[in-house]
Regions:
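Terminal RNA-binding accessory module
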Residues: 1-67, 71, 370
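Rossmann-like S-adenosyl-L-methionine
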Residues: 1-3, 9, 13, 218-431
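Short, acidic/hydrophobic/Gly-rich beta-strand patch recurrent on exposed beta strands
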Residues: 13-19, 141-144, 208-210, 349
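Short, conserved phosphate/pyrophosphate- and ester-handling motifs at nucleotide-, phospho-/glycolipid
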Residues: 35, 159, 292
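Extended interfacial segments that mediate partner engagement and assembly in macromolecular machines
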Residues: 55-67, 73-181, 201, 216
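Short, aliphatic-rich beta-strand segments
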Residues: 196, 203-212, 279-284, 384
């Protein structure tokens, strides 16, 4: 038996074995909440810890609720759904605090409570689902935790309904045309992933088929049928990924029907004090865009509030994507420079600036660490640096370059408390 004492950043229960030869061993158990006493079985055993699955909950901790989705306990997408949302927010705040203390060694910083999302179901504007065979039929869903076993999930409740509809039609087309599914063990087959994205502010959608090659039969007919059957579908794209890799996308996109982007209207209604503003954004299939548009308004509003931008400020936006933060910052500052490694996203960013009539902003393509010295030679030194790196955090070279600039303030937007705390420690040690 295991008593669950806390949660880790994945939402897994962290507990200890209560008796027997492994008494006291730390165990990570998905699908549990603090206070649970569970009968479990090991799926992985190391010297100092183990991973386990639940056989039976013997005592329920506070905050346990029924899962809204029937496959939430099987797929790897919703590791917190068995928990009351208020309890989730409390523990997520604690996880950030723990990262500050354990990794960044910061103990005198006040951590604000988590801001709740306006929507907790039906919010996700993009989904990338692997495909596989099950009993001879093609299925699409999500990977079972710590495996590449696909759990079919056609009615995922966190997805925006329009996203769910696009995936359903894409899957129907793959089945109808009998496209072969890619097998990552043998390297054979064609279709790897189905991808859908919707712009909640306009309802425009894109459908992407990720394949090992571009010579699939009937692509034009498939695209025509999708465009006819899905309301507001603006793009059908084939992405080619012929590498032996776990990366979802390759670097080649083929537009089969429609236009190469969708447009979203994003932000709050007014541009007054304390309000984010409202802008229009073009989004290419592979460009980064916050998957919870509703919560992203809160995120960007908070980030820009903490930046305390002044009318004469120069801002560098590092990892700028399609220019979302850059353009909202440009409404408040004198000049903004965005740096982004993904070239299609940079092209989107320039178009977005033009579409919104914003002229006090520019963008540079390239790795941030290499680009920043060139920016300093071409533009004024920034008063504020805003950075929104991927889950793995920022590169040390990028952090060093930013530290050397010594801006008035750095606003770091993160989706991973552990790598954020690691990077904060680096910046703190650099002064």
């Amino acid at each position: 038996m295991v008593r669950i004492e806390s949660l880790n950043h994945r939402g897994e229960g962290v507990g200890r074995v209560l008796s027997g030869p492994y008494e006291g061993l730390t165990v990570f158990v998905p699908g549990t909440v603090p206070g649970d006493v569970a009968q479990t079985f090991f799926v992985e055993k190391k010297k100092t810890f183990a991973r386990a699955q639940v056989k039976r909950i013997l005592e329920q901790g506070e905050g346990r609720v029924g899962e809204a989705c029937p496959v939430a306990s099987k797929c790897g997408g919703c590791s917190w759904q068995h928990m009351d949302y208020g309890v989730q927010l409390e523990w997520k705040t604690k996880i950030v605090e723990e990262a500050f203390h354990r990794i960044a060694r910061v103990f005198d910083c006040e951590i604000s409570p988590c801001v709740p999302s306006p929507k907790i179901l039906g919010y996700r504007n993009k989904v990338e689902v692997p495909v596989a065979y099950e009993n001879g039929q093609v299925v699409a869903g999500f990977y079972e935790p710590y495996t590449h076993n696909v759990v079919p999930a056609q009615d995922c409740l966190v997805e925006h309904p329009a996203v769910r509809n696009v995936i359903k039609h894409l899957l129907d087309q793959v089945r109808k045309r009998r496209y072969k599914v890619y097998n990552e063990k043998t390297g054979r087959g064609a279709v790897r992933h189905l991808v859908a994205r919707v712009a909640p502010g306009t309802d425009e959608a894109v459908a992407v088929l990720v394949s090992t090659g571009h010579r699939l039969s009937g692509l034009n007919d498939m695209a025509s049928e999708l465009m006819e059957s899905i309301p507001n579908l603006r793009s059908v794209v084939l992405n080619v990924n012929d590498e032996a890799t776990n990366m979802i996308f390759g670097d080649r996109d083929y537009l089969i029907a429609g236009r190469p982007y969708i447009q979203d209207v994003f932000g709050s209604e007014t541009k007054g004090s304390g309000s984010l503003g409202r802008l229009r954004f073009r989004i290419s299939p592979r460009s980064f865009y916050q998957v919870n548009s509703y919560q992203a308004v809160n995120l960007y509003t908070t980030a820009l509030s903490w930046a305390e931008l002044k009318p004469n400020d120069v801002v560098y936006d590092v990892y700028s994507g399609i220019g979302t933060i850059s353009l909202f910052a440009a409404l408040r500052a004198s000049f903004v420079v965005g740096v982004e490694e993904v070239e299609p996203a940079v092209k989107d960013a320039f178009r977005n600036a033009r579409d919104n009539g914003i002229e006090n902003v520019t963008f540079k393509a390239g790795k941030a660490a290499r680009a920043i010295p060139g920016l300093l030679a071409e533009y004024p030194r920034p008063d504020v640096v805003i950075m929104d790196p991927p889950r793995g955090g920022a590169e040390k070279e990028t952090l060093a370059a930013i530290a050397d600039i010594k801006p008035r303030s750095i606003v770091y937007v993160s989706c991973n408390p552990s790598t954020f705390a690691r990077d904060m420690l680096f910046l703190k040690e650099r002064g």
